[in-house]
Amino acid sequence: MAQAAKKQNLGTGRRKTSSARVFLRSGTGQIIINGLPLDEYFGRETARMVVRQPLVKLDVQSRFDVYATVQGGGDSGQAGAIRHGITRALIQYDEEGGEGGTWRSTLRKAGFVTRDPRMVERKKVGLHGARRGTQFSKR
């Protein structure tokens, strides 16, 4: 007979071109991203801070273990995608009877629930970039 699966909550987060699947389990507070600890995966402290934000806001960083797989984009986009995924997983945990359904409003006020719609604007034909044109010469 198969062993009972450990209870976990799944949250999918996206930011720019990054996509993250986040698994939230009760534990001691370790954060593993693509098989590496958070401190090894992200070199910049700001990216690590962004990932921890939802847990710190709710003061539950030592109650959950976070396992995330993320692909696409760069450091900033990946950190934002993981944060979005953690937020969704926390809301799912909360609404299934965790804390009485109060976390969503707290996380929404902090701005973590809304998916950031900003994307890189495409390069246009005849321009150097999305908006930069050729240099104007009066004569």
From Swiss-Prot:
GO terms of molecular function: RNA binding; structural constituent of ribosome
GO cellular component, one term: cytosolic small ribosomal subunit
GO process terms (BP): translation
Pfam families: Ribosomal_S9
Record-linked InterPro entries: Ribosomal_Su5_D2-typ_SF (IPR020568), Ribosomal_uS9 (IPR000754), Ribosomal_uS9_bac/plastid (IPR023035), Ribosomal_uS9_CS (IPR020574), Ribsml_uS5_D2-typ_fold_subgr (IPR014721)
Keyword vocabulary terms for this entry: Ribonucleoprotein, Ribosomal protein
Family per similarity comment: Belongs to the universal ribosomal protein uS9 family.
Matches recorded under HAMAP family: Ribosomal_uS9_B
Name of this protein: Small ribosomal subunit protein uS9
Species in which this protein is naturally found: Coxiella burnetii (strain RSA 493 / Nine Mile phase I)
